[in-house]
């Protein structure tokens, strides 16, 4: 079992774990690694979100074995509850974000291990409460030079069969039955009756708009991967790969393009093994100019999409006695020159050296460095429906540009000592000790300006002023952590086993009064399928009885929240 820190025998592992092989990843491949894991393991759950649907740029809420933390009102309002139950993600021994996992080159992955319960995740201490996803990439293979290519097509088809919505006549009938066009005041009821007559006239003219299909399309994306690897018997091996992935969402105009490049070098000299992995990731995502799908679910079918001149209407109904603010047509904004784009660049270099003075003893040191730069551009011209109710005095406030830029840098260093030995054929002992230090520093700035009278000018510096009563904003964070982990595992005759793990975690997020916290687990088990009375039970491959107790934690909160 690959835990990301230690490697242990599955026969003596007391935790709940699923190991997914490269063959399974290829057989059940989805549009990204998250959807692939969902196709394979039923405990890996991606929560459905009907607001964002199949938006390729929206980070899904991922859970392993259900919810461990409940969101606050602020989490729901700011849409940050996604982070609360997200599992810890480890790539080749180093933590990565959910966004990075979403854009990984799945052709470079050799296996994925899901650590599900406390006994399995206690070695990660304050980060393991939500489960752990351990990803191992392919190592270069010795032999002749090999060049391989793999391409695929991904088709996203919207399915509206679950939506049973009323047509125009049925919707009007429902409103009439509910008494929407009656009022105790005669002048108000007269205005309501006029609106009712206008709607009936529209229905008689054949207006019956099925809004749900208007912003949707069948998205056809494609993925390409090229891999080169080789190396001789002199101890030097290498591999290089590039991948381009173009994902088109079912919402018109939404897409996500990613590029990944990787160079992996390996050199073995006697009892020393050196590895270096350099990876560059680029991503560009565009949101749909048609807005969110839930807007179209709320629109009345007796509203028409276009006017008599064939142009898309800006307002679906006139402002009057019934509407204090005229309902806007989300299709109108799609005719404008909008910008809603995010880009990021990640450069990661992981280096490790492994020394095996004896067959039973391994000492490994590794360090990972990662830098990320991200930008966000959002432009709405003056004709956008957001500004339709601005007065004449506010004409020079129409048009808006939001620009954000952020940078982050992190390092992660660990030193691991592992000892494994068999005694007298029936006794097997594993002892592991790990020391880990990590830091992540980030900062971001946001500028929000307004005043773009001309819709064809969408450059940030052409704005007339900052947003009213606004100013540039920014944020910064610094997270540090340190941890010492010990693990002892014993198995007798491949039948009876015990496992004990202890970790002392220190983190800047804990606050000054208590910087360190202990986490631990212990478990026992019995491999029933190894007993003699099970030898003739050919239809059963594995039957294990195990029990464990663990204490884990979660630090999914802001860097300075303990100071608040």
Residue ranges and their predicted role:
Residues 10, 19, 23-30, 40-63, ...:
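Residues embedded in well-ordered regular secondary structure
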Residues 169-206, 294-333, 378-399, 443-472, ...:
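Surface-exposed loop/turn segments flanking beta-strands in extracellular/periplasmic regions
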């Amino acid at each position: 079992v690959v835990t990301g820190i230690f490697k242990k025998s599955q026969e003596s592992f007391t935790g709940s774990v699923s190991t997914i092989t490269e063959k399974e990843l290829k057989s059940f491949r989805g549009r990204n690694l998250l959807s692939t894991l969902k196709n394979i393991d039923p405990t890996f759950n991606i929560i459905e979100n009907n607001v964002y649907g199949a938006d390729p740029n929206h980070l899904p809420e991922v859970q392993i074995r259900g919810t461990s933390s409940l969101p606050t009102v602020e989490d729901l309002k700011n849409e940050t509850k996604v982070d609360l139950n997200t599992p810890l993600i480890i790539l080749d021994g180093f933590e990565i974000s959910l966004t990075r996992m979403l854009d990984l080159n799945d052709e470079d992955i050799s296996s994925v291990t899901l650590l599900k319960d406390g006994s399995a995740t206690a070695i990660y201490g304050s980060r393991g409460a939500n489960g752990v996803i351990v990803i191992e990439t392919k190592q270069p293979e010795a032999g002749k030079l090999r060049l391989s290519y793999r391409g695929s097509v991904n088709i996203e088809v919207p399915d509206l069969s679950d939506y049973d919505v009323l047509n125009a006549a049925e919707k009007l009938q429902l409103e009439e039955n509910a008494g929407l066009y009656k009022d105790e005041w005669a002048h108000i009821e007269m205005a309501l009756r006029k609106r009712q007559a206008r709607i009936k006239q529209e229905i008689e003219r054949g207006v019956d708009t099925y809004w749900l299909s208007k912003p949707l399309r069948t998205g056809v994306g494609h993925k390409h991967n090229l891999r080169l690897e080789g190396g001789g018997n002199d101890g030097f091996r290498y591999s290089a790969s590039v991948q381009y992935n173009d994902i088109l969402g079912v919402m018109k105009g939404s897409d996500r393009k990613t590029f990944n490049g990787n160079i992996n070098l390996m050199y073995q000299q006697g009892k020393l093994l050196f590895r270096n992995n350099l990876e560059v990731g680029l991503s560009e995502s565009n949101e749909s100019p048609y807005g969110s799908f839930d807007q179209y679910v709320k629109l009345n079918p007796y509203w028409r999409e276009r006017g008599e001149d064939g142009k898309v209407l800006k307002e679906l109904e006139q402002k009057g006695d019934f509407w204090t603010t005229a309902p806007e047509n989300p299709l109108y904004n799609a005719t404008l020159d909008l910008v809603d784009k995010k880009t990021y660049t990640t450069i990661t270099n992981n280096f490790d050296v492994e020394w095996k003075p004896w067959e039973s003893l391994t000492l490994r040191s590794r360090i990972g460095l990662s830098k990320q730069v991200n930008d966000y551009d959002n432009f709405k011209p003056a004709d956008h429906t957001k500004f339709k109710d601005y007065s004449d005095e506010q004409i020079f406030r129409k048009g808006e540009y939001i620009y954000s830029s952020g940078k982050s840098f992190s390092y992660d260093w660990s030193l691991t000592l592992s000892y494994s030995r068999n005694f007298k054929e029936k006794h097997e002992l594993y002892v592991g000790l790990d020391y880990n230090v990590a830091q992540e520093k980030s900062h971001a700035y946001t500028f929000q300006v307004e005043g773009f009278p001309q819709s064809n000018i969408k450059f940030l510096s052409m704005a007339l002023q900052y947003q009213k009563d606004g100013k540039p904003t920014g944020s910064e964070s610094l997270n540090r952590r340190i941890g010492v982990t010990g693990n002892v595992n014993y198995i007798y005759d491949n039948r009876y086993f015990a496992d004990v793990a202890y970790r002392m975690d220190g983190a800047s997020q804990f606050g000054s009064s208590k910087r360190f916290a202990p986490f631990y687990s212990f478990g026992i088990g019995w491999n029933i399928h190894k007993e003699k009375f099970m030898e003739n039970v050919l239809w059963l491959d594995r039957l294990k009885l195990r029990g464990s107790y663990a204490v884990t934690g979660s630090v999914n909160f802001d860097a300075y929240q303990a100071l608040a």
